[in-house]
Amino acid sequence: MVYPGTPEREDALLLVVDADDEAGRLLAEHFTRRGFRASYTAAGQDALDLAHAGRLRAAIVDVALRDMSGHALVSRLKEIEPRVHVLMTAGDYRPEFEVRARQIGILHYALKPADPDRIEAVVAKALGVVQSR
């Protein structure tokens, strides 16, 4: 589901990819309220389709997705858009997952429940946009 953003941030397509529908939708809605054009999906393949169709700037990807691993999705997103800023979330901490995520170039690794304001701060800084309150 794609949510519209404000004109000054509409070029910043932000994907939220999480098998937890409620958490994913809430995070996408948080970013929409803050002026981003956010899209939520629970499946990695849907995220890839959206990435091909739009100007992908950032993605928040959970480690565990319905149809592929979050690590595999991040690698493929970076093939589509090498400059994409990726944050990864996880329901429980496993050092090997964080190490692997950092090796494939993620910007930030957060444990759930992740603070939406903190996630927004990381995304805004990466994109060079001013946070709105």
Which functions belong to the PLM regions below?
Residues 35-43, 50:
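Short hydrophobic/Thr-rich beta-strand motif most characteristic of the beta2 strand and flanking loop
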Residues 66:
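The feature encodes the CheY-like receiver
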Residues 72, 92-109:
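Alpha4 helix (beta4-alpha4-beta5 surface) of REC/receiver domains from two-component response regulators
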Residues 25-33:
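Charged docking surfaces used in two-component/phosphorelay signaling
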Residues 43, 69-72:
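Acidic catalytic/metal-coordinating carboxylates
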Residues 49, 71-83:
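Short amphipathic alpha-helix used as the core "switch/output" element in two-component signaling
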Residues 1-19, 117-133:
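Non-catalytic signal-transmission and effector/linker regions of two-component phosphorelay proteins
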